[in-house]
Amino acid sequence: MTQYIYGDIRIHFFSEEIIRIEQSKDGRFCDENTFFVPNKSNYLHTKVGFTVDETGITFGKYRIRFPKNRRTLLGLSIEKEGKTVYRYKKLANTGELPPPAKTPCVFALSDSPRIVVPDNGYSYCGNINSSGYVIDECVRDVYLFLCEKDAKKLRKLFVGLTGQNELVRLSVLGGWNSRYYAYTEETAGQLIEKYERHDIPLDVMVIDTDWRKCKNGWGYDVNRKLFPDMERFLDYAHSHGVEIMFNDHPEPVDGASVFEPREVKYREENLQKLLNIGLDAWWYDRNWTTCLISPTKGVSCETFGLYLYYDITKNYFSKRDGENFTRPVIMGNVNDVFNGQYRSIKDSASHRYSVQWTGDNLCDLDSLTREIENLIKCSDNCIPYVNSDCGGHRGDPGKELFVRWMQFGTLSPVFRPHCDDQVKCGREPWAYDRETEDIVKEYIALRYRLLPIIYKNAFNNYVCGEPIFKSLGYEYSTDKKAWSRTDEYMLGNDILIAPIAGNKRE
């Protein structure tokens, strides 16, 4: 990489479109990959030509103006063809990208807190301080994306530097069954067979927290009263073409943060213990009474949880399978959408971790409307596999509303019907009557016909960060009617989806 040092400031050219502006701390600069910026090594051999004079650096159409004080970034600016397009200001890390129609000429991303990640990732390596992670708070280290008001370019640059979302297994894009319910080995098997009798495809089944022995939803010992032989059940599910995901509400080990060796050891051993008997995926859920402990205020426990569950799963599959290992799949909360209420995307790391859901929502029409908006907002922020508790975690929708939910679910990134154990009707297609079942089955069949298109766009997302399902404004950012719509979206570039919800009428 090309760089220039001006006093305590390093200007680092990762490419002609990504510039790093770093203020040294104690006379040192940071060259290691970090939690927020894991892909520095991709830019090692990039060369950018520039000229330097007393007041700044000129490269291409741009000029970086030095601050008068060589020891601070305050006063640094960037000009494009003589016009100022960026002035440095202190900012927090965020994963909230500007809406496509409001993409700036320059987008700034802070790598603070800066967390240097050990080479072995999230894996126990003995009693090493913070398991080899090094946290540096309040650094001034900013990456500038010269995206020139191009929303697609910004997202491609963003995921190239901050990390792509893993391309999920094809099964994840198929049909799910998910419910907070105390299944037994027998009833879970009966449900799988019922899908077969109704000629409805099922690819993933969630066994919620009652799979475990502890009543508080903690620990990793299997509830032998419900599942006398868990390995036998997992083999049975696989023989029917169904992958199994366990829900986990983790508790910290003796108050330890996620980087402390005893926490890393406990989590790694136990998550991998169940993967070893045939479990396919983990659902990292918020705990009702406690949560994992973040070692820094700058990164939430939701994001660190996504990270550690992903890394532990990936490490296990890599050791088991070798170079062509099974792609890891995890599910966790969108950070930060709380029980269907969108707040913001709090950091630039959480988008990397595959399936993310919007929390325990309700079943009413307003909730459906919000979930459509959540899909659009999250997709615009490089979270491609956002999904809802389709049909509502709580409540009993009428038949028409149930159908609307299922139609939306089949035309969204992940089709995961879900509810709790208090509802009168489950979320299976046959839960109401034959007419309702037939309609839902038609839309499930439509989803499977669309799978080649969905998967093609999933690969495109992996390569360049373009959403699978995207806002109208993403493709038509200069059309005010398009970018103002929060109730319609597209699959790829050619299929318009307009769910009937809220005030919309047929």
PLM features per residue range, with description:
Residues 1-8, 14-16, 26, 31-33, ...:
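Extracellular/luminal recognition modules and glycoprotein regions
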Residues 11, 19-21, 61-64, 496-499:
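Short, well-ordered beta-strand segments enriched in hydrophobic/aromatic residues
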